[in-house]
UniProtKB/Swiss-Prot annotation:
Residues 1-20 form the signal peptide. Gene3D superfamilies: Fimbrial-type adhesion domain (2.60.40.1090). Keywords: Fimbrium, Signal. The operon is cryptic under classical laboratory conditions, but is functional when constitutively expressed. This is Uncharacterized fimbrial-like protein YraK. Transmembrane segments: none annotated. GO terms for cellular component: pilus.
Length: 363
């Protein structure tokens, strides 16, 4: 029996693992970041918008151009990856909103194509590596699109994220002026990778900080006595009974009058309202509204005093005199007024008249 020769062979294939390297990217420098800010200066919020549940969009972000400065070595071909994270930490009334202050929540919306690789609008929420924004474009100095430190043929300048919008949501109506200090709302972070993998969360570096600042004003329309002038008539006074200094005429009955106001429904507004009364014809010793001046020397000789019957205050000053406003925004203040002799002795005959203004102020 003839045996066939056996030939054996072995193919050895060596294997090695290739790992993608990655790192952070800054704006203009590897540690740099730029700021885009929405400035809402001197914006008036009318009454129809100043209600819980109303939304409005803030001003367009101001932006500057910059260039990528990634930590990769010069000449390296890399891809760019982005991650956008909220800076505010207190969640708002629903997902995607964060608490800006006691009256406003804010939502950040990235616009499609405003960041390379972002194909649809995206609301900024808590991000993980699974929500990274990836772009398949390869950047390198060889193609005049270098992004690594030391690259001379660079990509850009750019202003990614400049079309981001902020939506403000009224959680609690407010009155008067609201100052929003410069507040970072979200941050666009960047990283590079030279393979198919994903950068780790620690690789990402701040590129763009998105912030808001400014002033909002919410005026409140108040009607006092339906807009009519409040007139208090003291009638005819016997001059012989009007001689005691800083006193009303003997036997005089003070005149009661009402100040009726309607500021709409303020029950859900965190601010408080007050009415302030100020004399416009002059004031003596803060409590006496000048109603007449003596013809011989222009010295005030007749004054008017008032008190709040419901507040237990005997005299209301005519300089920053404060009257209460009910939290509901409407009501009536019961007042009393009387004339006083400011100089003592018998006064000249004739008319007297004093005027004051009432202003509703916000606290």
């Amino acid at each position: 029996m003839k045996r066939a020769p056996l030939i054996t062979g072995l193919l050895l294939i060596s294997t090695s693992c290739a790992y993608a390297s990655s790192g952070g990217c800054g704006a203009d420098s590897t540690s740099g970041a730029t700021n885009y800010s929405s400035v809402v200066d001197d914006v008036t919020v009318n009454q129809t918008d100043n209600v819980t549940g109303r939304e409005f969009t803030s001003a367009t972000l101001s932006s500057t151009n910059w260039q990528y400065a990634c930590s990769c070595s010069a000449g390296k071909a890399v891809k760019l990856v982005y991650m956008v994270s909220p800076v505010l930490t207190t969640t708002g009334h629903q997902t995607g909103y964060y608490k800006l202050n006691d009256s406003l929540d804010i939502k950040t919306t990235l616009q499609a194509n405003d960041i390379p690789g972002l194909t649809t609008d995206q609301v900024v929420s808590v991000n993980t590596r699974f929500t990274q924004i990836k772009n398949n474009t390869v950047y390198s100095a060889a193609t005049q699109t270098g992004v690594c430190q030391g690259d001379t043929s660079r990509y850009g300048p750019v202003n990614i994220g400049a079309n981001t919008t902020f939506t403000l949501y009224v959680t609690k109506p407010f009155l008067g002026s609201m100052t929003i200090p410069k507040t970072d709302i979200a941050v666009i972070k960047g990283a590079w990778v030279d393979g198919m993998g994903s950068p780790s969360t620690g690789d990402f570096h701040d590129l763009v900080k998105l912030s808001i600042q400014g002033n909002l004003t919410a005026p409140q329309s108040c009607k006092i006595n339906q807009g009519d002038v409040i007139k208090v008539n003291f009638g005819f006074i016997n001059g012989q009974k009007f001689t005691t200094r800083n006193a009303m005429p003997d036997g005089f009955t003070p005149v009661d009058f009402d100040i009726t106001y309607d500021c709409g429904d303020t029950s859900k507004i965190k601010n408080s309202l007050q009415m302030r009364i100020d004399g416009t014809t002059g004031v003596v010793d803060q409590y006496n509204l000048v109603a007449r001046r003596r013809s011989s020397d222009n010295v005030p000789d007749v004054g008017i005093r008032i008190e709040n019957l419901g507040g237990g205050v005997a005299n209301i000053p005519f300089q920053n005199g404060i009257l209460p406003v009910d939290p509901s925004g409407h009501g009536t203040v019961n007042m009393r007024a009387w004339p006083v002799n400011l100089v003592g002795g018998e006064l000249e005959t004739g008319k007297f008249q004093g005027t004051a203004t009432i202003t509703v102020i916000v606290r």
